[in-house]
Amino acid sequence: MVTIQADEISNIIRERIEQYNREVKIVNTGTVLQVGDGIARIHGLDEVMAGELVEFEEGTIGIALNLESNNVGVVLMGDGLMIQEGSSVKATGRIAQIPVSEGYLGRVINALAKPIDGRGEISASESRLIESPAPGIISRRSVYEPLQTGLIAIDSMIPIGRGQRELIIGDRQTGKTAVATDTILNQKGQNVICVYVAIGQKASSVAQVVTTFQERGAMEYTIVVAETADSPATLQYLAPYTGAALAEYFMYRERHTSIIYDDPSKQAQAYRQMSLLLRRPPGREAYPGDVFYLHSRLLERAAKSSSRLGEGSMTALPIVETQSGDVSAYIPTNVISITDGQIFLSADLFNAGIRPAINVGISVSRVGSAAQIKAMKQVAGKSKLELAQFAELEAFAQFASDLDKATQNQLARGQRLRELLKQSQSAPLTVEEQIVTIYTGTNGYLDSLEIGQVKKFLVQLRTYLKTNKPQFQEIISSTKTFTEEAEALLKEAIQEQMERFLLQEQT
């Protein structure tokens, strides 16, 4: 028979009394009234904040978006198939935030900053709010440093500066993503961190972009945030803000970053879906009234930090798809009004074999030559005007039967200028190579060649200059100016290469 020892029992009771903690924990809970289509309506959750994360019984997380008098509208970050009517929900007291660290470089993640590339977890000690306020006026300075894209047409005539927001707009299949990916490839060795956000894209397209980055060694300074077409609308809506939070982390650490949103119109469609299901009143094209704010609060986060904050920068390149060239639709006009200029890609030019299919006439950068090095300004200053005059003359020449010699010469020069702007995909050029190309065209050195020979000659000239006149590149990179010495070296190289080229063509 077991003997009961009173002193042992009393000791245990005393210990328990001493360990007893009278802490009262208040949990804000609610009950699921209705769930479906990625939306849940919750009764209760009286003190929930707008945008607060809520947790369902079976582990799904949601965001409280609609705070109504008798229920709360929650959008789900998952399929929500296991959520049942009547199950409990608790408020977490947190606004959506993600972990941030250097460890994200070279990784492919989703909108919740979870890796989806099968390479294990990412360690991070800090976190940032997904939606943080944009820098104020005092925290910024004007854009003055160039962000080189490696594309002659952009860097010479529609320059992009670090901290600028430049829209890339055009119909489907006109090479918009190619312009953005070439820009990322060109940042190699430039100390710029790149973030590529794929919103509602095909998984195969995203995989292709990631493969290109890996093959070209661009993943070491790039983060890919991907929410493909089969992702829930909530995650497609959040993905751009996640990308912006990661880019901001580096910007506030005095680094230069570039972020590509591909594309915000898909984010707007996801937001429209969520809003309509939450029974928010529809506006133009059935978008909710705050769809402008959706994009403005995202793009305003791009900035050039003031010297007090370390002069970091975040350059935003949103990509918007138009329907048969209609830039007056709701989302394109909204994004055009928010950004500092746009690069317009034309389906007609693309089909005519002019690639990148940039319509230089209606593309514009509101930062302008402030985002160019002096050498580029010296060489490319007049090229946009010359091309515009050529386009006008070409349209007129279609109706004229006989043209005088001067007009014929101007047309021939224009055709060669247009030819030198053509570039293969994933073949960005350095600033020095671009200066060589533009100078050769604008100063008439290509006029004696056939149009079909222009590209071949320029490739050979750039190679010849690199091997035989390395001083040219040194002068441009050190002084950032097209000096008389540099011009003399270039003229010499053009003449020498032209003689070699013509002999080569004759044989």
Curated annotation (Swiss-Prot):
Gene3D superfamilies: 2.40.30.20, ATP synthase alpha/beta chain, C-terminal domain, P-loop containing nucleotide triphosphate hydrolases. Keywords: ATP synthesis, ATP-binding, CF(1), Chloroplast, Hydrogen ion transport, Ion transport, Membrane, Nucleotide-binding, Plastid, Thylakoid, Translocase, Transport. It is a peripheral membrane protein. One of its GO terms (molecular function) is ATP binding. Its EC number is 7.1.2.2. GO terms for cellular component: chloroplast thylakoid membrane; proton-transporting ATP synthase complex. The keyword Protease does not apply. ATP binds at G170, D171, R172, Q173, T174, G175, K176, T177. InterPro entries: ATP_synth_asu-like_sf, ATP_synth_asu_C, ATP_synth_asu_C_sf, ATP_synth_F1_a_nt-bd_dom, ATP_synth_F1_asu, ATPase_a/bsu_AS, ATPase_F1/V1/A1_a/bsu_N, ATPase_F1/V1/A1_a/bsu_N_sf. PANTHER family: ATP SYNTHASE SUBUNIT ALPHA, MITOCHONDRIAL (PTHR48082:SF2). F-type ATPases have 2 components, CF(1) - the catalytic core - and CF(0) - the membrane proton channel. CF(1) has five subunits: alpha(3), beta(3), gamma(1), delta(1), epsilon(1). CF(0) has four main subunits: a, b, b' and c. Belongs to the ATPase alpha/beta chains family. This is ATP synthase subunit alpha, chloroplastic. It comes from Buxus microphylla (Littleleaf boxwood).
